[in-house]
């Protein structure tokens, strides 16, 4: 175990045997964004009498989707509990906020005329977690991840906020925020301002403009989802140019689906745990049976 992990383990006994999934209301004090209830996973260490400051994974569902869909289809509780069982109760705290407001709406994860989703996700959610939960404060200890539209949000927002997030774990994401044609989005979300859309809302532009070499990209796509594979390669190239550590995975037999998400996030959790000092990876990425490593 790393020194950080040893200190955390010593600080947080006694421990329950498993973590908990809770449904919470996260205030929208800065954004005024109308969000559905969020869900969170608290590992055993977070439930102890003296919880340590733990890493955070802020995870976003696709659209249509919901926080409960991500928790269930992503197999979050079982995956996190299995990790915690191998690390003396230590695992990241998982935040699953609602980025869209309703299942049929796409917020573009941006501050637009249809709501301030970016401010909600990167300010309201983050401030609430830092106030209410035993979370670490430094950017290296925070990751964002997501599936499909949630993956797109990840590659938009993480490079725009290097002071908050140090890692991104998108699966089957898009090249850009998408809800109809670009022209339609520019009119309906940005009051006709094309530069507001193209600027830092498009992931490769956000990465080039404000991504840093302190950040890292751990990404994947289903083998049958050719468009997402192409998107992944393009965004990974941009991340490398920004000096980021980049890992690309393919999930054999999977498409644009939750099988891909689960397969990518299993090694992704081990990778993030090592990155944040919870424990070292015990095998190489090539030894995970459900994924193939591109980079």
Question: Which sequence ranges carry the predicted segments?
Answer:
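Non-catalytic cap/lid and distal C-terminal segments of serine-dependent acyl enzymes
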Residues: 1-295
């Amino acid at each position: 175990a790393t020194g950080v992990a040893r200190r955390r383990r010593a600080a947080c006994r006694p421990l329950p045997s498993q973590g908990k999934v809770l449904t919470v209301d996260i205030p929208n004090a800065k954004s005024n964004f109308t969000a559905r209830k969020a869900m969170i996973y608290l590992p055993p260490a977070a439930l102890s009498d003296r919880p340590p400051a733990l890493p955070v994974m802020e995870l976003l569902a696709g659209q249509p989707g919901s926080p409960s869909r991500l928790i269930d289809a992503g197999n979050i509780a079982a995956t996190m509990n299995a990790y915690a069982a191998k690390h003396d109760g230590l695992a990241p705290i998982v935040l699953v906020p609602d980025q869209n407001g309703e299942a049929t709406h796409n917020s573009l994860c941006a501050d637009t005329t249809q709501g301030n989703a970016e401010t909600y996700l990167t300010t309201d959610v983050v401030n609430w977690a830092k106030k209410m939960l035993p979370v670490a404060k430094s950017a290296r200890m925070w990751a964002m991840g997501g599936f499909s539209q949630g993956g797109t949000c990840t590659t938009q927002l993480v490079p725009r906020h290097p002071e908050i997030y140090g890692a991104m774990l998108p699966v089957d994401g898009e090249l850009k925020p998408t809800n109809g044609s670009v022209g339609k989005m520019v009119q309906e979300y940005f009051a006709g301002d094309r530069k507001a859309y193209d600027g830092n809302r498009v992931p490769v532009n956000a990465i080039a403009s404000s991504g840093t070499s302190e950040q890292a990209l751990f990404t994947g796509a289903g083998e049958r989802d050719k468009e997402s594979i192409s998107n992944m390669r393009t965004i990974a190239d941009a991340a490398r140019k920004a000096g980021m550590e980049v890992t690309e995975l393919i999930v054999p037999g999977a498409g644009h689906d939750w099988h891909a998400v689960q397969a990518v996030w299993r090694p992704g959790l081990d990778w993030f745990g090592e990155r944040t000092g919870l424990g070292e990876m015990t095998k190489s990425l090539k030894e995970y049976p459900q994924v193939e490593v591109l980079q």
